[in-house]
Amino acid sequence: MTSQPISNETIIMLPSNVINFSQAEKPEPTNQGQDSLKKRLQAKVKVIGVHSSLAGSILSALSALVGFILLSVNPAALNPASLQCKLDEKDIPTRLLLSYDYHSPYTMDCHRAKASLAGTLSLMLVSTVLEFCLAVLTAVLQWKQTV
């Protein structure tokens, strides 16, 4: 009395005085369960990716906001720095003071430094505002997509 498995059916052999039970339904292949598991895992990875992208957009917006605040305060410090440059200009050697000209190299250097610094800071400020707007827009769109 041995039992032998058959590929599509499961037969249980019992002693001769007991009834023979057979299973007519086909068992579910294990590949289908694995495919379902793969689909679920891929969906979970996609959801995690969307949430991490949303978090990245929010962090980008916050860092742009901090940069905007810092860059807004910096141009206010340009005038005291320019004044300091002009005060340092008066400490030049006495031989140059005799032929003092408004357009001396020291004065021109102060103006060039102030102009280049103001231009750089204003460009950084505009770029930071643009980054902030894009990051907020991206975060809002991703948030609406996940909800």
UniProtKB/Swiss-Prot annotation:
Signal peptide: none
Family matches, as InterPro entries: CD20-like
Single Gene Ontology BP annotation: cell surface receptor signaling pathway
Keywords: Membrane, Receptor, Transmembrane, Transmembrane helix
Domain of life: Eukaryota
Residues in compartment: Extracellular: 74-120
GTP-binding keyword on record: no
Tissue specificity as recorded in UniProt: Expressed by malignant and fetal tissue at very low levels.
One Gene Ontology term, aspect cellular component: plasma membrane
Main location as per UniProt: membrane
Pfam families documented for this protein: CD20 (PF04103)
Transmembrane parts of this sequence: 53-73, 121-141
Segments in the Cytoplasmic topological domain: 1-52, 142-147
Membrane topology: Multi-pass membrane protein
Subcellular location: Membrane
Family, similarity comment: Belongs to the MS4A family.
Function of the molecule: May be involved in signal transduction as a component of a multimeric receptor complex.
Descriptive protein name: Membrane-spanning 4-domains subfamily A member 6E
Organism: Homo sapiens (Human)
High-level lineage: Eukaryota, Metazoa, Chordata, Craniata, Vertebrata
